Amino acid sequence: MKRQKAVSGERTPCEKRLFCICWDIVEKDMIVLLIIKNNNDIINNMNANGEKMILDKKLYDNYVKILENELVPALGCTEPIAIAYAAAKAREVLGEFPDHVEMRCSGNIIKNVKGVTVPNSDGQRGIDVAAILGIVGGDASRELEVLESVKQEDIEKTRELAAAGYCTCTLQEDVANLYIVAKVCKGGHYAEVTIINRHTYITRIVKDDVVLFEAAVSEESSNYVDKSLLNVKDILEFANTVNIDDVREVLKRQIEMNSAIADEGLMHPYGAQIGRTLLQVYGDDVKIRAKARAAAGSDARMGGCSMPVVINSGSGNQGMTVSLPVIEFAKSLFCTEEQLYRALVVSNLVAIHQKKYIGSLSAYCGAVSAACGSGAAITYLYGGTYEDISATIVNTIGNVGGIVCDGAKSSCAAKIASAVDAAILGHFLGRKHHWFQPGEGIVQKDVEGTIKSMGYIGRVGMKDTDKQILNIMIDQVKVD
């Protein structure tokens, strides 16, 4: 986004309308008066008292690295891609085309792969398809873009091998939520690759009973970042003071890639067409566009679109949810590129902050935590204070905190639309000084306590929910 030029001495539309809208709203005879002031204190890295705001360098560098590590491109839904990556890596280690492949996966992986179209597969679905395609045409060196180089003959061979029972998959119980083992065999030889906790984090490589590589699940590698340092107050200070050049590359890529797949989802009939339906039925007000574009990106991604997405917290759907609504509101408010980047810092880090309590995969729908991030960023664009942004987050959690994840599939787009709608409502409630009070459900005395409560529900409270969802999906329980 380019800053709009103004005649000398005039303010741009954004400076006239946006930064900073005071939150003392005076209502009289149904007319709302907004008191607007310049926001140079934020752009010039000053706080409200005119003091220079400087984060501790360790904290600053950690926040930059979190964004660099988390905001990476992925081709297709990340769970089938992780399976393809593990299988492709196992074949690479074996050194020849295997006779068959055996997959052992956690329930959450099975749940998130069962109903989603594998990218670059010509509409095929399932763990076996993801694993076989990774073996046949995958490039393990590309990690989350492992299937980018797949050719048509690879797709046809995958279809044949899947029909012949080339790949088997078993449920591995009592393991991490994100757990994948790919074992490929040829004659009397085999290779096995294990991934735990992160979609590309290989913890063990074995060939013919010889351990070639092993890493502790909690090992602090060169890419380690301390997410425990995240909190809403410091996130806002970081967003206000960060040198944009330190985050420009990752955020520019997020804007470009995620906007492109949203366009694709609106132009073509993917999935349940949630994004297209929203615009057709409700019009193109910014509040509708914010929901529709995020949903459309998910329509395309869940429908097997091979376009890359910049993810958040290991999820493409969450990556689109934290970014696309913010981009739409920034456009409607005539924001500069810098203002958009600072808002995206808020949305991405707020979402990651919440997910660190929930975990990578859970029965808790990640669209909610991502929408909390985009809602916080929208409030930030309107000049909201820490208290205002906290109110948006709490209002969103209090509204849609109970949405469950029953796997990656077309309905994810609808859940994204619902979560973003709740975040926008939470924002406008906060503007009118309305928010859910401590003691109402899981709402605590402050935003950090409420985020922790939500995380506890997702990580601990929904464990059995997760198990029962999987039982229903794989027909292991009779529902009367």
What are these regions (language model features)?
Residues A162-G304, I469-D480:
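Signature of multi-pass transmembrane helix bundles
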Residues I54-V64, P98-I109, D285-G304, T336-Q354, ...:
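Acidic-glycine-rich active-site phosphate/pyrophosphate-binding loop
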Residues R91-V93, P119, F329-R342, I352-S418, ...:
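Hydrophobic alpha-helical bundle architecture
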Residues I21-N45:
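Short, positively charged and aromatic/hydrophobic N-terminal segments
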Residues P73-K89, M307-L324, C365-S369:
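Conserved phosphate/anionic-ligand binding catalytic regions in large, soluble enzymes, centered on
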Residues A74-T78, N108-N112, P119, I196-T200, ...:
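A structural signal for small-residue-enriched, beta-sheet-centric alpha/beta enzyme cores
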Residues L55, F97-V101, R142-L147, C169-T170, ...:
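Flexible, glycine/charged-enriched surface loops at secondary-structure junctions
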Residues I81-I180, V184:
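Early transmembrane hairpin of solute transport permeases
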